[in-house]
UniProtKB/Swiss-Prot annotation:
Chain spans, region Disordered: 85-128
Keywords noted in UniProt: Ribonucleoprotein, Ribosomal protein, RNA-binding, rRNA-binding, tRNA-binding
Gene: rpsM
GO CC list: cytosol; small ribosomal subunit
Disulfide bonds: none
GO MF annotation, one: structural constituent of ribosome
Role description: Located at the top of the head of the 30S subunit, it contacts several helices of the 16S rRNA. In the 70S ribosome it contacts the 23S rRNA (bridge B1a) and protein L5 of the 50S subunit (bridge B1b), connecting the 2 subunits; these bridges are implicated in subunit movement. Contacts the tRNAs in the A and P-sites.
Name of this protein: Small ribosomal subunit protein uS13
Family according to the record: Belongs to the universal ribosomal protein uS13 family.
Ranges of biased composition (kind: Basic residues): 89-128
C-alpha cells in the first residue's frame, strides 16, 4: 500500500483519483503531479513502482503544503483574522458566512440548526 504525506492511498484506484485522498490535492493538482512525474493517469496505485512513488513524493515536497501543514496554515489564517478584529474574523467568530452571502434566509449549514425563540414556545403552550 502506497503512503504519501501520511495518507494511505487506496490500491485499487487509478493514480489520478488516489492522489485526491490527500488533503489539498484535487483532480487538477493530481493530474499536474502525475504529468510532472511522467506517470500514466490510468495506472493503478498498486501498480506504481517505489521509484514512481518517490518521484511524486519529491514533487509534493517542492510544491507546497498538503495534509497537516495545510490544515494548520488555514487555521492559523483564520485565527489571525479573528485576532486582528477584521470583518472576516468577526464573521468567523460568530459562525456566519464569511464571503458576503445572505443570512436572512439560508446559511443553515454555517449557522447550525434553528433555535426557536422563547416567545414562540410560550404562545404554542398557551393555546392548548
Amino acid at each position: 500500500m502506497a503512503r504519501l504525506a501520511g495518507v494511505d492511498l487506496p490500491p485499487g484506484k487509478r493514480a489520478e483519483i488516489g492522489l485526491t485522498y490527500i488533503y489539498g490535492i484535487g483532480r487538477t493538482r493530481s493530474k499536474s503531479l502525475l504529468h510532472r512525474a511522467g506517470i500514466d493517469f490510468d495506472k493503478k496505485i498498486r501498480d506504481l513502482t517505489e521509484d514512481e512513488i518517490n518521484k511524486v513524493r519529491t514533487i509534493l515536497e517542492e510544491e507546497g503544503a498538503v495534509e497537516g501543514d495545510l490544515r494548520k496554515e488555514i487555521s492559523m489564517n483564520i485565527k489571525r483574522h479573528i485576532e486582528m478584529g477584521s470583518y472576516r474574523g468577526l464573521r468567523h467568530r460568530r459562525s456566519l458566512p464569511v464571503r458576503g452571502q445572505r443570512t436572512h434566509t439560508n446559511a443553515r449549514t454555517r449557522k447550525g440548526p434553528r433555535r426557536g425563540t422563547v416567545a414562540n414556545k410560550k404562545k404554542a403552550t398557551g393555546k392548548t
